Amino acid sequence: MEKIVAVVICGLVALSAAGRSAAATNRDDLLRSASHLSGLPVRRVVPEEVLASPRYDGALLQATYREYPRLLRSIDTALYARLGLMPRSLQAQLVPDARVSRAWYDPAARRLLLRRTPTAQRTRVVNELVRALVDQNFNLRRITGLRVRDRDRALAARSIVDGTAALASGVTASPVQGPPLERFLQFESGLGPGKALAKELRYLGGSRALASALRLFPQTTEQLLHIDKFLERERALPVRLPTRIGDWKLSASETFGELDVRSLLRAFSVPNAVPTAAGWGGGRVGLYVSPTGQTTAVLALRWDTIDDAVEWRDAVTRYVGAAFPGATARDCPPLDRCWSSTWDVASGVLGTTSVFASGRASDTIAAALFTQK
């Protein structure tokens, strides 16, 4: 009997060892495949951890909150509401649904997280391993905290990393659908533009050209969207928002890039959104708060040419019609047009500068920005 037990134990140990060996072999094969497809060398083994769904979701959510803290989510919630991206009474769901993810590389911990069930497809695992290789060769921790400091730059950096991984693995973006806020956030993900830039760079200069984008990162989403802007390292035109306008105080301010403008127009199916946004030269969005706690959003943009600014002015009319249904238009010099709706809205273009405001006293605030030197 003791001999039988010993044989069974030995058999189980052998099977366990064989299972571990097979898993290690499969992991190594996937890493080699990621290296071959991306052209990035393997510097070290990528640690991995298989987690039950609750732990996996928790780890992903914690990482998201680390890069997108509560204060920033609160600012964006107020901003998106005043841009008409969601109903006034709705609390924005700005954090991605972790349940759709099955594999994810965490640059902070430098490990690959895998959901136990359902398991990730091979292409998704390879995609995350390519991101791990980008980290090994170019250090993704450089992006840590960037979203808090510079919205547009963070979008550009994240997009070229995700685009490089998608180009290698074959992962494609999901079809854009849903209400305006969901559409906006899907367009903002930047997977398509990042993949397109990675493909162009590889075509023009091979792996070395792509490596330059991963080493330096596009500084703006304009550079992400236009390879000539990236190669020239063209900087955004400066945009300043005053700290006070009358009794209203600037409470928050972020960069607002070409991808933001494009995504905002596309979220409402505004015609010619892409060519309109292409004239972007610089942008900033901010929230002004009154002494009584009311909040108004402002969007100040600079355009490359007067014609580009005129294109934006024409697009704004269609955007307001879609984002603020039933809005009543009125003249409000020196601005081009004001509207009354769920939010009071005001817009104006002067030369190559445009101002858009949404909220209480939007016409007064926009006019002050419109005429500032």
Where do the protein language model's features map onto the residues?
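Pan-zinc metallopeptidase signature
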Residues: F184-T295, A300
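Catalytic zinc-binding patch centered on the HExxH motif and its immediate surroundings
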Residues: D57-L71, S89-A109
